[in-house]
Curated annotation (Swiss-Prot):
Name recorded for this polypeptide: Aromatic peroxygenase
UniProt pH dependence: Optimum pH is 4.7 with ABTS as substrate. Optimum pH is 7.2 with benzyl alcohol as substrate, and there is another optimum at pH 6.2. Optimum pH is 7.2 with dimethoxyphenol as substrate. Optimum pH is 6.0 with naphthalene as substrate. Optimum pH is 7.0 with pyridine as substrate. Optimum pH is 7.0 with veratryl alcohol as substrate, and there is another optimum at pH 5.5.
Keywords: Disulfide bond, Glycoprotein, Heme, Hydrogen peroxide, Iron, Metal-binding, Oxidoreductase, Peroxidase, Signal
Enzyme class: oxidoreductase
Cofactor binding, note field: Binds 1 heme b (iron(II)-protoporphyrin IX) group.
Disulfide bridge map: 321-362
Glycosylation sites: 54, 184, 204, 225, 329
Documented EC number(s): 1.11.2.1
InterPro entries in the cross-refs: Chloroperoxidase, Chloroperoxidase-like_sf
Binding sites annotated in the UniProt record for heme: 79
Family recorded in the similarity comment: Belongs to the chloroperoxidase family.
Gene: APO1
PTM (free text): N-glycosylated.
């Protein structure tokens, strides 16, 4: 079975202290777009970076990238990997970056696979980023970004539920309960418990399979709006493999994450002392182990708890190209139904970049025509 390139709930949408602050343009009316776009400082997006020239294990918690505590106004979000990279200076420490900076950071700091990085970064940028200014936020919006575009623009960054971020995260709660982005001690203790029960005190792929199923069942039982279809169906499985693949010291590389290191990444956004990145590029390696532990069909609760209903129209692991097509033709197109001139050009450019990360064998779609 083939599996689509996966990335955890990475990235962003919006503004930065060093630049004029801009929110996502998604959801604005044509009249609002016509008024706002001429006021923005347009940036020509850089080309997606290629793979690392040297992708071996190396010290990444080094003198050039020390951990620093948050300053007032710094942004962090639901993704422990991105939070950690920002706190070590691989990303701008304020939590706002361009797609190029993010792809470089996840490769250099964690040895994340290039194709997966391109796929996830541009997917998030398309739905949560500002395509004119080429800026993305890894978490919440902030007053330091300046005036937002008028409603109904999406201004939530990675914290925005239902565009990129989704339900049943390992250490963050569902958006239904009010906080989908902060570290959740209760959920982390569940991760520790499952690591003790199924991994001999270490988090590994066996633990990932059991914990993924547990979090799905918890959401079915408590969240009447639980949704587990299409994009989230893919990323939910992929993200459970990342701690075993990326948070284990690369000199050991045994897929066994100890709990001190897990807490350091998940809670404190901090690499362990003397930490080496993985010895080769990787992303969702072993995801088939997680999927096969407790196979699920995509679906959702229908307005009440314990009402999980299979959605036969959702893409799944046998139809990765359908996931890509629905993301572009439905999700992106619904956010930008009739873009013109500069915005249309930016959309087409970023859709082209996004397609570079899509699984081989899929056919590119052009919802806005070809430039």
């Amino acid at each position: 079975m083939k599996y689509f390139p996966l990335f955890p709930t990475l990235v962003f949408a919006a503004r930065v202290v060093a630049f004029p602050a801009y929110a996502s343009l998604a959801g604005l009316s044509q009249q609002e777009l016509d008024a706002i776009i001429p006021t923005l400082e347009a940036r020509e997006p850089g080309l997606p970076p290629g793979p690392l020239e040297n992708s071996s294990a190396k010290l990444v918690n080094d003198e050039a990238h020390p951990w620093k505590p948050l300053r007032p106004g710094d942004i962090r979000g639901p993704c422990p990997g991105l939070n950690t990279l920002a706190s070590h200076g691989y990303l701008p420490r304020n939590g706002v970056a361009t797609p190029v900076q993010i792809i470089n950071a996840v490769q250099e700091g964690l040895n994340f696979d290039n194709q997966a990085a391109v796929f996830a970064t541009y997917a998030a940028h398309l739905v949560d980023g500002n395509l004119i200014t080429d800026l993305l936020s890894i978490g919440r919006k902030t007053r330091l970004t300046g005036p937002d575009p008028p409603p109904p623009a999406s201004v939530g960054g990675l914290n925005e539920h239902g565009t990129f971020e989704g339900d049943a995260s390992m250490t963050r709660g569902d958006a239904f309960f009010g906080n989908n982005h902060d570290f959740n001690e209760t959920l982390f203790e569940q991760l520790v418990d499952y690591s003790n029960r199924f991994g001999g005190g270490k988090y590994n792929l066996t633990v990932a399979g059991e914990l993924r199923f547990k979090r799905i069942q918890d959401s079915i039982a408590t969240n009447p709006n639980f949704s587990f279809v299409d994009f989230r169906f893919f990323t939910a499985y992929g993200e459970t493999t990342f701690p075993a693949n990326l948070f284990v010291d690369g000199r050991r590389d045994d897929g066994q994450l100890d709990m001190d290191a897990a807490r350091s990444f998940f809670q404190f956004s901090r690499m362990p002392d003397d930490f080496f990145r993985a010895p080769s590029p990787r992303s969702g390696t072993g995801v088939e182990v997680v999927i096969q532990a407790h196979p699920m069909q995509p679906g959702r609760n229908v307005g009440k708890i314990n009402s999980y209903t299979v959605d036969p129209t959702s893409s799944d692991f046998s139809t990765p190209c359908l996931m890509y097509e629905k993301f572009v033709n439905i999700t992106v197109k619904s956010l930008y139904p009739n873009p013109t001139v500069q915005l249309r050009k930016a959309l087409n450019t970023n859709l082209d970049f996004f397609f570079q990360g899509v699984a081989a064998g899929c056919t590119q779609v052009f919802p806005y025509g070809r430039d």
